[in-house]
Structures are given as C-alpha cells and as structure tokens.
C-alpha cells in the first residue's frame, strides 16, 4: 500500500526492514479485546510483553483509545490475524478481525476522517476483498476500517475505482522491481518525507542511470 501513497518513497524503502510503531502495537493489542471489557492494566501488560521497549508515556495514549472505544458497540472477533492471498493478482495480506457474521475489519492506529475513509484504507479493503473472493468464490462487498484512537468503525463498500487503483498500484510495483524510478504523485506528502532531497534530484530516472 505504500506504493499507492508515494511510489518514490516505496522505491527507497523497499530494501529497508519495516517495524510497527508503538502506537500501532497498542491499537493492535486493544483490538483483541473489542466487544469485551477493556481493562487498561491487562492490555498494557500485554503491550509490554509484545513490545518490551514501548515508550512508557504511551500508557496515556492507551487510556485515550480505551475511552474512545468504550463509547462504541463492537462485535467480538471469532477469528483474528487471518492471512489472505490471491495467486491471480499476486497480493497477500492480513485481516485483523472477523466477526460472527463473517464481516472483516482492518485496524488503524490513526484518527478517523470527519466523514468517509482515507484513500489508502479503501485500497487495503479492496485488496483484502480480492483475496477473499479468490479464496471463497464469493463476491465480497467490502469491510470495516477500525480507527482505534477515535473508537470509530466505518464500513467501506468496494467500488470499481478502488479496483482500478489497485491494478494501477500493481503496475507501479512491477515497474519499481524492474529497476524503474517512479514519478512522485502531485499530492505526495513530500514535506514529511526523509527522502525529499533524493526524490527531487533523481525522480524520473532509471536505476541503471543512477549507478
């Protein structure tokens, strides 16, 4: 999904080891308790087991998440961390939660938009839907995006534009892996990017031209 956000950043990051943030660890661990009593002490102990070096000050962040999530009626999960894959499309991923009705959810450690969902999250839902359709043989209408810090769950119905964007993203990925240096999108988040100088000096060239 990082290709969709900014393919140039993905180009530079593709050989770097990825690690989840402390905030994500907290939100992810809390998600296992949704639909049940949210005990801050219990969840924090689990967080420290999963991530011993977690920033202690983020205990307050956990409290904020619990307060927000306590205002929403959640369905407990019957399955968690379910791997999905599509051989046809060459994609794979993980579903965070599946409820008793078969509805799937992905967990986000960011706040929710006032309305709707982020483009990258819509793409995640579309990718999971494609995987599930291939695995089950059934049409998948969409899935939930659960913004833990705000205690918000939003259903996104997959649209044709989501599937088109997913196909375009796959094309970008193949080009990058073939050695191409992609163009950055017009709305790329350049100001917060650590690769901004590299991007401005080399965008549009192929890897062979940079060596």
Residue locations for each model-derived region?
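Well-ordered beta-strand positions in beta-sheet-rich domains
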Residues: 92-94, 122, 155
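Short beta-strand-loop-alpha-helix junction that forms the active-site gateway
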Residues: 107-117
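Metal-dependent nuclease catalytic cores that hydrolyze phosphodiester bonds in DNA/RNA
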Residues: 1-98, 103, 211
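Short, conserved loop/turn and helix-capping segments at secondary-structure boundaries
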Residues: 118-123, 160
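Short amphipathic alpha-helical face segments that pack within enzyme cores
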Residues: 123-131
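Metal-dependent nuclease catalytic regions and adjoining charged, substrate-binding loops involved
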Residues: 75-90, 115, 134-211
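Active-site catalytic microenvironments for nucleophilic, acid-base chemistry
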Residues: 17, 131-135
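Glycine- and acidic-rich phosphate- and metal-coordinating loops
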Residues: 104-108, 144-146
């Amino acid at each position: 999904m990082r290709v969709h956000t900014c393919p140039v950043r993905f180009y530079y990051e593709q050989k770097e080891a990825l690690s989840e943030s402390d905030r994500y660890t907290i939100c992810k661990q809390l998600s296992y308790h949704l639909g049940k009593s949210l005990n801050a002490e219990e969840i924090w102990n689990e967080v420290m087991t999963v991530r011993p070096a977690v920033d202690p000050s983020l205990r307050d962040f956990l409290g904020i998440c619990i307060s927000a999530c306590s205002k929403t009626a959640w369905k407990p999960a019957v399955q968690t961390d379910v791997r999905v894959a599509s051989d046809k499309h060459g994609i794979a991923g993980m579903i965070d939660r599946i409820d008793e009705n078969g509805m799937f959810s992905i967990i986000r450690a960011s706040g929710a938009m006032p309305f709707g969902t982020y483009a990258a999250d819509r793409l995640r839902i579309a990718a999971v839907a494609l995987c599930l359709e291939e695995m089950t043989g059934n049409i998948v209408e969409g899935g939930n995006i659960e913004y833990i810090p705000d205690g918000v769950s939003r259903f996104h119905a997959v649209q044709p534009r989501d599937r088109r964007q997913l196909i375009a993203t796959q094309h970008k990925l193949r080009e990058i892996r073939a050695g191409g240096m992609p163009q950055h999108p017009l709305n790329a988040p350049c100001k917060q990017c650590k690769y901004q100088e590299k991007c401005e000096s080399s965008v549009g060239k192929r890897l062979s031209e940079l060596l």
